[in-house]
UniProtKB/Swiss-Prot annotation:
Part of the 50S ribosomal subunit. Contacts protein L20. It comes from Halorhodospira halophila (strain DSM 244 / SL1) (Ectothiorhodospira halophila (strain DSM 244 / SL1)). One of its GO terms (cellular component) is cytoplasm. Belongs to the bacterial ribosomal protein bL21 family. One of its GO terms (biological process) is translation. InterPro entries: bL21-like, bL21-like_sf, Ribosomal_bL21. This is Large ribosomal subunit protein bL21.
Length: 104
């Protein structure tokens, strides 16, 4: 069984046991989170497509890690002017493991 969920403005195709990184969620490591924004659920030849969500569909996941991605560095400069700017950014994420999918 698989599902397509929306989290943090992105869509993910997930199955039970999958480990994925989503935008930061307000949960502690070891807690269980539930994604109710299920767009599609499928198993074998049977597929349920939501309009826009599958009624009663939910995906449960366990939080494995709260961390930040590797640093993305941006440098801008103008030649011959002594103008240099350097900026770095690390986006926070939550790593989750899918524990259950319910079609509703």
């Amino acid at each position: 069984m698989y599902a397509v969920i929306r989290s943090g403005g992105k869509q993910y195709r997930v199955s039970e046991g999958d480990v994925l990184r989503v935008e930061k969620l307000p949960a502690e490591v070891g807690e269980t989170v539930q994604f109710d924004d299920v767009l599609m659920v499928g198993s074998g030849s049977e597929v349920k497509i939501g309009t826009p969500h599958v009624e009663g569909g939910s995906v449960k996941a366990e939080v494995l890690e709260q961390d930040r991605h590797r640093k993305v560095e941006v440098t801008k400069f103008k030649r011959r002017q002594g103008y240099r700017r350097h900026h770095g950014h690390r986006q926070p994420y939550t790593q989750v493991k899918i524990t259950g999918i319910s079609a509703g």
